Amino acid sequence: MTDPTSFAAAWIADWNAHDVEKILSHYAEDVVFHSPNSALRTKGEKTFFTSREELRPYFNFAFHIRPHLRFTLLNFCQDRQGLALIYQDETGATATELMDLNQLGQVVFARVLYDR
């Protein structure tokens, strides 16, 4: 099992650095990624993504529309399959990202939940 403290710290740091390639390195090539923002950002064309390549423009767009995007880790929970990161953004909104990890410590399934 991937060390959750190290994973969470690296994941948050890469998001805060706005380094899309480093962010994507946390995800498997064939990741399945669900977020309520998927439909909003793709004008209803996608409700989830099924690869790292599909995530690249989605993450880039997030930094384009939110140039001051910043996450603060609040907590994490773990089990044998993966972990959940609970974090807050620069606006004060809280998110929980549920992540199933493969044996390489990469996210193979993610689901993001937001408080607003």
Question: What are these model-derived regions, one by one?
Answer:
Residues 22, 28-74, 79:
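A solvent-exposed, acidic/Ser-Thr-rich amphipathic alpha-helical stretch
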Residues 2-5, 53, 93:
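A structural signal for well-ordered alpha-helical segments within the folded catalytic domains
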Residues 11, 23, 31, 55, ...:
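Hydrophobic pocket/interface hotspot
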